[in-house]
């Protein structure tokens, strides 16, 4: 697996703040400040990758703002506008038992108890009550709540999720 395949997109640079190189970040994480846990970021745009080191970060009015080492003025900061933020997957904190990062579930094959392939997880969505697997396959799109009532096993090694779910649900 290459270095780029081991990285996960976590947000993007949406703008600049002030004149000293601070950047505004749109985080695609549950908590935007969780990006501050990762000192090394990879910025990707148009096939170009830049590795940067986080110098400082803060949340201001629910907005994540960061400063990178060596980015000390507004013009240099603005040149990073639109870059996607990627973090190496191996930098993620370990999960508890029966907890998963969404990025690890996307792409997994979902089968039911009859061993019928329902499709692959294309995405997940939050509903407030629980997360829902969005599965795409030859049976169309299937939505399955990601709760123990319907999800029997998640085998991250073989990338298979077994669900108590029929095609007629």
Curated annotation (Swiss-Prot):
Subcellular location: Cytoplasm
Cellular component aspect of the GO annotation: cytoplasm; ribosome
GO molecular function per UniProt: ribosome binding
InterPro entries noted in UniProt: PRC_barrel-like_sf, PRC_RimM, RimM, RimM_N, RimM_N_sf, Transl_B-barrel_sf
Source species, domain of life: Bacteria
Keyword annotations: Chaperone, Cytoplasm, Ribosome biogenesis, rRNA processing
Disulfide pairings: none
Span of domain PRC barrel: 97-169
A biological-process GO annotation: ribosomal small subunit biogenesis
Family: Belongs to the RimM family.
HAMAP family membership: Ribosome_mat_RimM
Domain description: The PRC barrel domain binds ribosomal protein uS19.
Subunit structure, interactors included: Binds ribosomal protein uS19.
Function in brief: An accessory protein needed during the final step in the assembly of 30S ribosomal subunit, possibly for assembly of the head region. Essential for efficient processing of 16S rRNA. May be needed both before and after RbfA during the maturation of 16S rRNA. It has affinity for free ribosomal 30S subunits but not for 70S ribosomes.
Name of this protein: Ribosome maturation factor RimM
Lineage of source species: Bacteria, Pseudomonadati, Pseudomonadota, Betaproteobacteria, Neisseriales
Name of the encoding gene: rimM
């Amino acid at each position: 697996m290459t270095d780029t395949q081991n990285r996960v997109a976590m947000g993007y640079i949406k703008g600049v703040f002030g004149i000293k190189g601070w950047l505004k970040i749109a985080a695609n994480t549950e908590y935007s400040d969780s990006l501050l846990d990762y000192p090394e970021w990879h910025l990707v745009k148009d096939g170009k990758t830049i590795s940067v080191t986080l110098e400082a970060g803060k949340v201001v009015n629910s907005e994540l703002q960061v400063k990178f080492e060596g980015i000390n003025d507004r013009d240099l900061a603005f040149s990073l506008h639109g870059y996607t933020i990627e973090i190496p997957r191996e930098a993620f904190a370990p999960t508890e038992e029966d907890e998963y990062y969404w990025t690890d579930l996307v792409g997994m094959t979902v089968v039911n108890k009859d061993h019928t392939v329902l499709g692959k997880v294309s995405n997940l969505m939050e509903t407030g009550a629980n997360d829902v697997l969005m599965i795409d396959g030859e049976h169309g799109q299937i939505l399955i709540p990601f709760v123990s009532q319907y999800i029997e096993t998640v085998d991250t090694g073989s990338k298979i999720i077994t669900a108590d779910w029929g095609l007629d649900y």
